[in-house]
Amino acid sequence: MYDVRHVLRKAGLRSTYSGYNYLASAVALVLKDQEFYLKNVTSNLYRVVGEQYGVSNMCVEAAIRTLINSYWNQNSNKILSPLLGYPVFDKPTASEFISMLADYIQDHSSR
């Protein structure tokens, strides 16, 4: 199994953002049960991550969004597209980003 934080670092994400830990936890949860957690991201995924860290689901979402915005403004798709192996033209939403990273880890952990 791939280490989620290793993949986040490989993608160029900075651990200085609180959203980094929330994102790592969110991706790990999605790897356990993608259908459940991605069905209703706010009330399923962000709620559980928020409970782990003692914050609200809105705080989790905002922190992950801030991390993605900063990442995208600095890197655009220069790192993400080559890492994933397909072009990413537009900034992904938080749930899309989580899904992309989880898919990448699933694809590469089975090799």
Predicted regions: what is each one?
Residues 53, 62-65, 72-111:
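C-terminal engagement/docking regions of AAA+ P-loop ATPases
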Residues 19, 60-63:
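Helical mechanochemical/support elements of P-loop NTPase systems and associated helical scaffolds
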